[in-house]
Amino acid sequence: MTQKILLIGNSDGIGAAVTRTLIARGEQVVGLSRSPSPLGPDGPRHILQDITAPEYPQVLATLLANEGPFDVCIFCAAIGSKLTLPDLSQEARVIDVNFTSMVRTLAALAPGWLERRQGHFIGLSSLADDFYNADSPAYTASKAGFSHYLVSMGLKLRLHGVYVTNIRFGFVDTKLPKASWKPLMMTADQAAAHVLRCLETKPRQLSVPKFAGLAIHGIRWMQSIRIWWS
C-alpha cells in the first residue's frame, strides 16, 4: 500500500538517500528543506523553507491543508558545530535546527494523527546524545534533547495509535561529522536502509551500530564518575 511521506531536511545526506529509495519504491513523497531537491525539477514536490524561520509552522499548516494528512514524517534535518572560543554565536542556531524545529514539526502533525489514530514520526538522532563533548556542546545537547523528547513522546502517543521512532546513528559519511576520527562509519545508503526498515517495524528506538552505542555509553559512564568527583 502506497504511503504519503513528508521528509524534512532531504536535500543531501541520509535524507536524500531516503528520498531516492522511497521514490524507487513508488511511495508518494513531499520534501522540505532549505536547499533544492536532490532529484531536481523532475523529482517529487519539494518546498524550499528554512525550518528555523518564524513562518515555518504556518508553512506546515498550509501544506497539511492543501495536501491532506501524511502517513509518515521523517525528520532528517541537522547541522553540526565545532565550538571555537570565544565565538558562541552559532550555538543557539544548532539547537534550533536540530531540536526545536523537530518539536515544532511534530506539534503540527500530531493533532491530525491523533484524530485519525494513526501516524508515524521518525527522527534521525545521534549516538552523540549519550556523552559530553566540550568541542561540540550545542550538537550533543541538541541530540540529547532530541532523543529524550522523541522516546518520551513515543511512550505517550503510542497509546493513541501514533508511532514515534528515534534512530540514533553513529558516524555516517555525510557533511555533518566534524570529528577527525570516525570509526565504524557507514554510507548514507546504509543509513537509509535502517530508516526504511523502521517504517515497517516501528521501534521506539534504534541505535546503529549497536557496538558503538555501547562504547559511547561506557565513555559517558566514565565522564559521569569524573564529573561527580571533580
Where do the protein language model's features map onto the residues?
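N-terminal Rossmann NAD(P)H-binding glycine-rich loop of SDR-like oxidoreductase domains
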Residues: 11-20
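Conserved NAD(P)H cofactor-binding loop of Rossmann-fold oxidoreductase domains
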Residues: 74-82
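Short alpha-helical oligomerization interface
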Residues: 83-96
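Active-site helix of classical SDR
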Residues: 106, 142
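Residue(s) in the substrate-gating loop at a strand-loop-helix junction
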Residues: 126
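Active-site loop-to-helix junction immediately N-terminal to the catalytic Tyr of the SDR YXXXK motif
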Residues: 132-140, 152
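C-terminal helical subdomain
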Residues: 166, 181-217
